[in-house]
Amino acid sequence: MNSLRLHGDVLSRGDMLDFAVNVWPAPRPPALEQALIDAVRSARYPDESRARAAIAARHERPESEVLLLNGACEGFWLLAHSLRPRHAAVVHPSFTEPDAAFAAVGTPVTRVMREPSKWMLDPRDVPADADIVVVGCPNNPTGNVDPPDVLRGLEQTDRLVVVDASFADFVPCDPGGDVVIRSLTKLWSLAGVRAGYLLASAELVETLEGQRQPWSVNAAACAALEVCAADVETPRRISEQLAELRADLVRGLDALGVRTWPSVANFLLLELDDGERIVDELRARGIAVRPCASFPGLDGRHVRIAVRTEPDNKTLLAALEDVL
């Protein structure tokens, strides 16, 4: 498999304890569950209008600046195929689908590497002639958030700054950017529904919308987007739970002598001297984690783990204690 297209979902069998995929493990809110059921039962074509209005209201933007997506990943591919940039810069280590999308249309890509001790970005490392820059905030797999002044440092005339905010529901922040791509996969546990959206200028949204097939966002995704955009309590509650679970997991890893980096998201990046062996031994015990050698700038020592429930996290810590 092309390493740019390797993602955590291929690493976990159905019966494995899945720390490879960063999807919140708790049940979905009842209102969301019912909306999904009602959408599947309906025989109507998808109608994006209510979801678009709800998202616009949440972000206090005109509806013309909202584009629903068949998962956040569609946004990167739409941008690449619609704009055909001259020179793309992608900040790494990070999600690799933007690289794959640009490669598919022949756009040269420069990988701008974060400083590895704290995974900070220096905007001066971005080539001056890059007319599109993609950066994660919060960043996957490092879990950090770039300060607003760093993101502003990417801005430049005739350049589009694209922020992958797929994990932003876990953090009460507005990442900014000319284009912001968000996902319902992570916090709302909707990986299979493929629901995301893009915020940008009305002109760019119109351009992107004109390049895709009709009804690309299914009825279940539209229903989910409408419900989730109006629900501010669930992200707040989950963020509080996550902070406690993540802190407990970090303490357990510290006790085992495992290096981690500070994270605001629902995952942690680990450094393990014998990472490839440990990944295999955990897999033999029915636990899937994400080896990170396929991320530019990382290698076999780096492993990403999701933050799951307290019992699941304790199971992982016990298994790590056995194999370290």
Where are the language model's segments positioned?
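PLP-dependent aminotransferase class I/II
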Residues: 28-29, 178-259
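Conserved PLP-anchoring active-site segment centered on the Schiff-base-forming lysine
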Residues: 80-103, 108, 112-115
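Short loop-beta-helix segment that forms the pyridoxal 5′-phosphate
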Residues: 56-78
